[in-house]
Amino acid sequence: MGKKRSRDADGQGDVEMADPAVTKRDDDDSSDDENMDIVNVDFELFNYDSQIDFHGVKTLLRQLFDTDAQLFNLSALSDLIIEQNTIGSTCKVDDKANDAYAFLTVLNLQEHRAKQPVAQLIEYLTDRAKSNDSLAGVLPELLASDKHVGLVLAERLLNMPAEVIPPMWTCMIDEIEAAVEDKEPYEFSHYLVVSRTYREVASSLDQSERKQKKAREEAELQFFHPEDDEMRKHAVASGAYDFTKEGEAVADSKRAFQEMGIKPCGFMMLIEASKFQGAVQAIAEYIGTAT
């Protein structure tokens, strides 16, 4: 993998990652394991570039917020992320001019709370937190206070290997430390990580309303990103919440294996700043062990 130097606006610096292998099956015989080819893909991390990254970041934000993406001014939010071009990374293949396959950033909610996209996010996250017992007791009050909370936004294409994640998070921690040394507003009390999860639910075509409700209550959370399952162990509060714009019929259109549907949910993890680096180290170890 290419390297990205902390706070170097041209990208490509100090964090190494072994090239993940991407497996491609021969189209002529998809059932024959002997036709499996191993393709080494070289991923590189870059700082944000306003001339290149707007559409890629906006597309990934739309994926992150799923059906609730329509509630936000994603264009303004993308611009704000890109303006912070020394904090966070995009992950690309081959060339800086390509669209991002993944992105990671942190926004100071207190510093930017008067800006429309951040005000929308604060209102939305406060409302959604109230629907989850773990989050309701701490997050609404914290977001209404004058404490500096770092909102972590991260997303990647679903077929991206998990190995790209630890270098991105490690880079960002280094960049935050450098920014704090430069007296920039990145000294946080907490980090609020927004992600997605899902439940497998029986098709609404096959269930009465009572059975649907019971199935939703019993369905176990599954994670699109395996690192989230590890990171939540370090959170003072975490939990899933329903998207406000998604009805049960949507899950029916995404029928998965064994006649089950996929019901995406939002997911938040609130981590104390003093425990954040440990959480990042834990997901690096977890991904290294799991692969």
Curated annotation (Swiss-Prot):
Pfam family, one: BCCIP
Major subcellular location class: cytoplasm
UniProt entry tagged with the keyword Nucleus: yes
Highest taxon, organism lineage: Eukaryota
Location of the protein in the cell: Cytoplasm; Nucleus
UniProt keywords, alphabetically: Cytoplasm, Nucleus, Protein transport, Transport
One of the protein's GO biological processes: protein transport
Region (Disordered): 1-34
Entry-linked InterPro entries: BCP1_family (IPR025602)
GO cellular component: cytoplasm; nucleus
Cited function: Involved in nuclear export, actin cytoskeleton organization and vesicular transport.
Similarity field: Belongs to the BCP1 family.
Listed name of the protein: Protein BCP1
Organism in which the protein naturally occurs: Chaetomium globosum (strain ATCC 6205 / CBS 148.51 / DSM 1962 / NBRC 6347 / NRRL 1970) (Soil fungus)
